Every structure is written in C-alpha cells, then in structure tokens.
Amino acid sequence: MIKGIKFISIPVRDQDRSLEFYTKKLGFQIITDQPFNDKQRWIELRIPGADTGVVLFTPEGHEERIGAFQAVSFWTNNVQKTYDELVSRGVEFLAPPTTADWGSSAIFKDVDGNQFVLGSK
C-alpha cells in the first residue's frame, strides 16, 4: 500500500535562483543536488523535520507549468507569525492572511511565480 508522498516536483526556470529562494528564504534543507542531464540537476530539498521532499525540476516539454498555481499547501502552527517572518525575508504574498471557519491561510509566490498556500493545520 501507499505509505506517503516521497516528493513533490516544483517546475522552475533557473535552478540556482530557485535553490537560493527555497533554502535562504523558506529554510528548506538540501538533500540531493547532483547532475540529472546536460541541462538540469536533480535538486531535492526537505522542510526540516518533514518526510516529503521538494524537487526543483522541470521535465523537458513541460515548461508551461512554470509560474502556475501548484495546488500545494504548506502548513504552520501560526499563519500570521510565519507570514510576518517570510515577508521580512522578502517572500511575496498575494495578500495578508485571511481567516475562515476551517483556519487561516495566505498565498505566496516563489521566484518563478509559482503560487502556494500557507495554511494552518
């Protein structure tokens, strides 16, 4: 049976620029950074303490996915506090956090315009 999600792949335009964003601004750790082919590297990151990896890789022929909404939601215990911290690091949000019956959330963008949800668990 399926045990979990090994990694999600985020399409990026410039792997070095994206690697800096995800490690320096979001605090992800590098798990693997090695050549994949003559054009790209296989870069796998992980949120400290998490099981699921994040791969910064765009399969050839899928460049149109760069900058799209990724339907990925990252969670935190305190959306407002995390929002404030990420804004201070230069992360761009579409709007401040909002609160609904199910919790708080805010949408942020990476350096390629990919959009992600930051939400409470």
Name every feature range the model reports, one short phrase each.
Residues M1, I10, I31-Q34, R41, ...:
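Vicinal oxygen chelate
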Residues I5-F7, F69-V72:
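Eukaryotic phosphotyrosine signaling hubs
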Residues S9-T52:
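Core segments of cupin and vicinal oxygen chelate
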Residues F21, Q80-E85:
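Short amphipathic alpha-helices within nucleic acid-binding modules
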Residues P48-G53, G61-E63, V79-K81:
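Short, charged/polar surface micro-motifs in flexible loops or helix N-caps
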